[in-house]
């Protein structure tokens, strides 16, 4: 039976529950991963056939949903039947020869270990050592690897720095093109049961001399790429100038006059400023090369998408509807302490406004909530009464703490009122019946 996530719509549906907005980006990622999983399914029956894996570049500022996208994909890795792992580019170097840095190839140790976890979750450990090793290797070879801070390895700086970064990019290129890498030795201990004696014993399986092959792995690169929009806009402007020049040339810049002379050449007019579309502002291969990446490496990443900065409206929508929003997180924290937290719409708007002002995006929402509610949560520690906390927009603007309602006292008053009303009703009925 084909994996349901070979359907891109099913992947996007999962992303939609947590990552709000960014429709173009989510579609591109969902389609690429679905094709990757479909290729893995196809190779079970036709191992000789290979479809080129589409690697993806996600460009976007801090707090726009890039990391949240990874978290959602990570939750699905057992159903994907392949590891989904994120690594920070800055934690590694090309070969590990620079200032005792860790070589990038060591990421495959973690990939292989995670593949083993997935294998045992799905199939258990009843097979013999060779079968387990083969099964784990197949899962590892289909890994989806996300490399964060990808923009930080762009060629820049002094000669030594450029040399190191070029080495890094060359190493990465070899990985994407397809290469084999040795895995550090490790062991897996399993418990076996003797049916004759009903005794348990431990068996140690040595996983040694193992390799992973990156040919069928998928790579997703993430980065803010600060300033690349200027490169893209400059290119678009130059293209617009060229089109304007060509248009005017087609209308004969040197116009023939009735007297038989040529008039003065007309200057090429500056094109009017235009509002570029989302699709136009996706950096081209040439833009990324100009930013500082090797042409060969860029050519291996055919899918490029941009996560746009989140507006106040988008952040309010996230607070209200995302399953992992900062609002829901703080509601859980208060609930664990026996309290109820409510925010009015104006409060959510103020919180979103602060996050946008700081340039922190969705990532900054939790920080703003912490600043507003941490003291309240501390002061209420150990409180036995049932208290409702109301955070209002006008109180945030005025720098006031949230309102606290003693629900225990309110419940007591309501109960007493109910008893009184019931007693009065009973008395009236007795009088009317008599």
Predicted feature locations:
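Terminal-proximal interaction/regulatory segments of ATP-powered molecular machines
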Residues: 337-349, 353-370, 375-383, 428-434
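Conserved ASCE/P-loop NTPase catalytic core
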Residues: 2, 8-18, 27, 33-308, ...
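Interfacial loop/beta elements and low-complexity acidic/Ser/Thr-rich segments
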Residues: 407-411
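Conserved C-terminal helix/linker of AAA+ ATPases
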Residues: 43-55, 345, 366-406
């Amino acid at each position: 039976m084909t994996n349901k996530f070979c359907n891109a719509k099913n992947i996007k549906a999962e992303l939609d529950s947590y990552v709000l907005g960014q429709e173009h980006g989510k579609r591109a990622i969902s389609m690429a991963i679905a094709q990757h999983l479909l290729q893995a399914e196809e190779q079970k029956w036709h191992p000789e056939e290979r479809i080129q894996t589409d690697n993806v570049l996600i460009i976007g500022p801090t707090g726009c949903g890039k990391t949240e996208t990874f978290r959602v994909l990570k939750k699905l890795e057992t159903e994907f039947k392949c590891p989904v792992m994120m690594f920070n580019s800055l934690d590694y170097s090309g070969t590990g020869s620079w200032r005792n840095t860790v070589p990038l190839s060591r990421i495959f140790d973690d990939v292989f270990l995670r593949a083993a976890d997935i294998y045992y979750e799905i199939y258990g450990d009843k097979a013999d050592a060779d079968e387990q090793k083969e099964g784990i290797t197949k899962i590892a070879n289909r890994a989806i690897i996300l490399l964060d801070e990808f923009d930080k390895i762009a060629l820049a700086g002094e000669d030594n720095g450029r040399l190191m970064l070029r080495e890094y990019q060359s190493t990465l290129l070899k990985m994407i093109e397809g290469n084999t890498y040795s895995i550090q030795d490790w062991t897996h201990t399993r418990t076996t049961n003797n049916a004759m004696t009903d005794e348990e014993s431990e068996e140690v399986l040595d996983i040694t001399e193992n390799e992973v092959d990156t040919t069928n792995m998928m790579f997703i690169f993430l980065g803010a790429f600060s300033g690349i929009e200027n490169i893209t806009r400059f290119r678009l402007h130059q293209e617009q100038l060229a089109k304007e020049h060509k248009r005017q040339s087609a209308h004969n810049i040197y116009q023939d006059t009735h007297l038989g002379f040529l008039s003065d050449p007309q200057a090429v007019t500056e094109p009017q400023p235009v509002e570029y579309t989302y699709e136009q502002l996706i950096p081209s291969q040439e833009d990324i090369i100009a930013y500082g990446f090797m042409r060969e490496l860029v050519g291996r990443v055919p899918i490029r998408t941009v996560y746009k900065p989140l507006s106040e409206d988008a952040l309010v929508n996230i607070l209200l509807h995302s399953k992992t929003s900062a609002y829901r997180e703080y509601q859980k924290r208060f609930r664990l302490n026996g309290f109820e937290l409510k925010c009015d719409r104006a409060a959510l708007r103020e919180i979103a406004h602060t996050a946008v002002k700081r340039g922190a995006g969705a990532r900054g929402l939790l920080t703003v909530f912490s600043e507003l509610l941490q003291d309240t949560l501390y002061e209420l520690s150990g409180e036995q009464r049932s208290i409702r906390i109301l955070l209002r927009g006008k109180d945030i603007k005025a720098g006031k703490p949230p309102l606290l309602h003693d629900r225990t006292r309110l419940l007591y008053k309501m109960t007493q009122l109910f008893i009184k009303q019931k007693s009065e009703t009973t008395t009236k009925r007795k009088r009317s019946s008599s």
